[in-house]
UniProtKB/Swiss-Prot annotation:
UniProt entry keywords in alphabetical sequence: Acetylation, Allosteric enzyme, ATP-binding, Cytoplasm, Glycolysis, Glycoprotein, Hydroxylation, Kinase, Magnesium, Metal-binding, Nucleotide-binding, Phosphoprotein, Transferase
The protein, known as: ATP-dependent 6-phosphofructokinase, muscle type
Binding site for substrate: 164-166, 201, 208-210, 264, 292, 298-301
Protein residues bound to ATP: 25, 88-89, 118-121
Function summary: Catalyzes the phosphorylation of D-fructose 6-phosphate to fructose 1,6-bisphosphate by ATP, the first committing step of glycolysis.
Binding site for Mg(2+): 119
Xref: Gene3D superfamilies: 3.40.50.450, Phosphofructokinase domain
Region (C-terminal regulatory PFK domain 2): 402-780
Subcellular localization(s) per the UniProt record: Cytoplasm
GO terms classed as biological process: canonical glycolysis; fructose 1,6-bisphosphate metabolic process; fructose 6-phosphate metabolic process
Length: 780
């Protein structure tokens, strides 16, 4: 962005006014969006107004519409719900109510409206916009507004952000609040699992989501449930027999518990509701199992927003302001949404229409169509769930292949989930699956055993690495590794791990020249808290680490708020990769985040100190600074702490905190469980195909570059990339990819922390159309 363009961003909002409101059911992360809209609005020079109590506040006006300041959105990020209040509003549905709302906006000169809510709230906003000119002429006729006021406010711009825990809005992969709701559900499922195992019970859990089965589906994937009932795909007519057979099979395999997940809108093929109680009665009557029902209810809306929702809310809020300020009378009202990890703008009414089409398809019992309309992400979740839950492994192993799975590098939450799904999908395909303990070292020493179906039972929710993981690379022990590949007849290798898994893969490729035994297909599933594996935008375990850092920062900020005038300097992990520091900075509302990828000088440190000195003069008397562990060898955490302590004398005092290895622990978040499960399934499917492809003269021989890949999430899809091709994109000295997508989120961090920056202010999304997205551009 040139200096002039940047200057344009900072003056884009001058003379304009934006109102922000939250409507409909509340969702965690709405506050992050409100905070971003307010701060970016102020950054561009616009005036920003809070509308309290949703549309009701818009209709009632007066004290309900208040101007927001920079400080008024401080300490909001970590709060659940919506601070400015929300209400379901009857008045706004009537034209009379909308007339009053228009009057209130015109009087304040507000012509830009940012609505955060579900599909109902967004449809209401669009109606309001289409009637705007008629409403103004009515107000003018009635003498409530002058001709001048009418001309000044001659059109209304609207942008929507989807805040709903149900994730039922078409066109966006994740709505604000969905991830946090999954956190609440998984916390409960984990807690119930322990008591169910003690008593050998069956639990029926009912989750929210109205007519959308997303929460139920992802929960089932994330906890390895025995059965799930979702409205989009009712069970076959003989489901009662099938369910009971499935539950008793699980028990005979040695499981001590059964978990059944029910979406509140679940129905059978005839459209008759399936209730939790009816399922309980069925299980008790047919099988005599001790069965309990737990209806989760409004717990799912509560609690602290997850790191994902805070970042999502913040990114969407920034994009919303840009969309409003760039809008013209001819641009359609748009929704800012997420596709893969990219912000996109979609026409509001197209999204609403598709969302209505789903309801219509379900009412007409066209369930396949409803599934398709939900998008590719939903379909993928369903396919993987069906594979893992409903298909029995074949008894005979004729024509089977032998695949080995291992962990390499440092432990990361979600590794076990990846191993579980790899093992089970492998068994379903009729393969022999071996697990290797302690990484390449174990492969060399022959610490290898065969895994059966129940070997990996209950692994999804367990943190760390149950197979054991080491950073050792294979080169030194090619002899022993080759011998064991022959001894155990290993025909394919799935490596779950971090940067070492990738470099180990490269070494295996080089070793193929000397050792024929190494000519077997292998795939790397990136799993590391640092998120520094080339070929993937995300790695398994990073989301869990991010939430751990966030939780700690929240507690630290609370302590600082109590003591006043205190600045905390926190050191995060990540090696040379600044992903954790940047994303945690965004999610925890840090004043600065120092990273290796963005070199900084003593002058930058000085600017930050001066910035904090200014901040202490406002009502917000605390600071939070994050520092990546290897961002600079001389400006260490101690150095920065000493500098801040000296410069802040008499104005603020400083404290430091090194988070350390707690970032590698904890039980995996729903995102990591789900991501790992899907990656494992995808890797095993690829592996089966590759082995068949490389089968020649009774043995496996794979020596092409595409037989050694990294499986990664790239923008909107899961892709396999040959490790040799990724070599060019890697900075081996610092163990990071040369290009990293999240660096473009850095300016948002700075704007939200009130820095006057000369940088591109936004990742800039262009208006797209939803039909294109449905035809297969959604992420996997």
């Amino acid at each position: 962005m040139t200096h002039e363009e940047h200057h344009a961003a900072k003056t884009l909002g001058i003379g304009k006014a934006i109102a922000v409101l939250t409507s409909g059911g509340d969702a965690q992360g709405m506050n992050a969006a409100v905070r971003a809209v307010v701060r970016v609005g102020i950054f561009t020079g616009a005036r920003v107004f809070f509308v309290h109590e949703g549309y009701q506040g818009l209709v009632d006006g007066g004290d309900h519409i208040r101007e927001a300041t920079w400080e008024s959105v401080s300490m909001m990020l970590q709060l659940g719900g919506t601070v400015i209040g929300s209400a379901r509003c009857k008045d706004f549905r009537e034209r009379e109510g909308r007339l009053r709302a228009a009057h209130n906006l015109v009087k304040l000169g507000i012509t830009n409206l940012c609505v955060i809510g579900g599909d109902g709230s967004l449809t209401g906003a669009d109606t309001f916009r289409s009637e705007w000119s008629d409403l103004l002429s009515d107000l003018q006729k009635a003498g409530k507004i002058t001709a001048e006021e009418a001309t000044k406010s001659n059109y209304l711009n609207i942008v929507g952000l989807v805040g709903s825990i149900d994730n039922d809005f078409c066109g966006t992969d994740m709505t604000i609040g969905t991830d946090s709701a999954l956190h609440r559900i998984i916390e409960i499922v984990d807690a119930i699992t322990t008591t169910a195992q003690s008593h050998q019970r069956t639990f029926v859990l009912e989750v929210m989501g109205r007519h959308c089965g997303y929460l139920a589906l992802v929960t089932s994937l994330s906890c390895g449930a025995d059965w799930v009932f979702i409205p989009e795909c009712p069970p076959d007519d003989d489901w009662e027999d099938h369910l009971c057979r499935r539950l008793s099979e699980t028990r005979t395999r040695g499981s001590r518990l059964n978990i059944i997940i029910v979406a509140e809108g679940a129905i059978d093929r005839n459209g008759k509701p399936i209730t939790s109680e009816s399922i309980k009665d069925l299980v008790v009557k047919r099988l005599g199992y001790d069965t309990r029902v737990t209806v989760l209810g409004h717990v799912q809306r509560g609690g602290t927003p997850s790191a994902f929702d805070r970042i999502l809310g913040s990114r969407m809020g920034v994009e919303a302001v840009m969309a409003l300020l760039e809008a013209t009378p001819d641009t359609p009202a748009c929704v800012v949404s997420l596709s893969g990890n990219q912000a996109v703008r979609l026409p509001l009414m197209e999204c609403v229409q598709v969302t209505k089409d789903v309801t219509k398809a379900m009412a007409e019992r066209k369930f396949d169509e409803a599934m398709k309309l939900r998008g590719r992400s939903f379909m993928n979740n369903w396919e993987v769930y069906k594979l893992l839950a409903h298909i029995r492994p074949p008894v005979s192993k004729s024509g089977s292949h032998t695949v080995a799975v291992m962990n390499v590098g440092a432990p990361a939450a979600g590794m076990n989930a990846a191993v579980r799904s790899t093992v089970r999908i492998g068994l379903i395909q009729g393969n022999r699956v071996l697990v290797v303990h302690d990484g390449f070292e174990g492969l060399a020493k022959g610490r290898i055993e065969e895994a059966g179906w129940s070997y990996v039972g209950g692994w999804t929710g367990q943190g760390g690495s149950k197979l054991g993981t080491k950073r050792t690379l294979p080169r030194k022990s090619f002899e022993q590794i080759s011998a064991n590949i022959t001894k155990f007849n290993i025909q394919g290798l799935i490596i779950v791990g971090g940067f070492e898994a990738y470099t180990g893969g490269l070494e295996l490729m080089e070793g193929r020249k000397q050792y024929d035994e190494l000519c077997i297909p292998f795939v790397v599933i990136p799993a590391t808290v640092s998120n520094n594996v080339p070929g993937s935008d995300f790695s398994v375990g990073a989301d869990t680490a991010l939430n751990t850092i966030c939780m700690t920062c929240d507690r630290i900020k609370q302590s600082a708020a109590g003591t006043k005038r205190r600045v905390f300097i926190i050191e995060t992990m990540g090696g040379y990769c600044g992903y954790l520091a940047t994303m945690a900075g965004l999610a925890a509302g840090a004043d600065a985040a120092y990273i290796f990828e963005e070199p900084f000088t003593i002058r930058d440190l000085q600017v930050n100190v001066e910035h904090l000195v200014q901040k202490m003069k406002t009502t917000v008397k605390r600071g939070l600074v994050l520092r990546n562990e290897k961002c600079n060898e001389n400006y260490s955490t101690d150095f920065i702490f000493n500098l801040y302590s000296e410069e802040g004398k008499g104005i603020f005092d400083s404290r430091k905190n090194v988070l350390g290895h707690m970032q590698q622990g904890g039980s995996p978040t729903p995102f990591d469980r789900n991501f790992a499960t899907k990656m494992g399934a995808k890797a095993m499917n690829w592996m089966s195909g590759k082995i068949k492809e490389s089968y020649r003269n009774g043995r496996i021989f794979a020596n092409t570059p595409d037989s050694g890949c990294v499986l990664g999430m790239r923008k909107r899809a899961l892709v396999f990339q040959p490790v040799t091709e990724l070599k060019e994109q890697t900075d081996f000295e610092h163990r990071i990819p040369k290009e990293q997508w999240w660096l473009k989120l850095r300016p948002i961090l700075k704007i939200l922390a009130k820095y006057e920056i000369d940088l591109d202010t936004s990742e800039h999304a262009h208006l797209e159309h939803i039909s294109r997205k449905r035809s297969g551009e959604a992420p996997a």
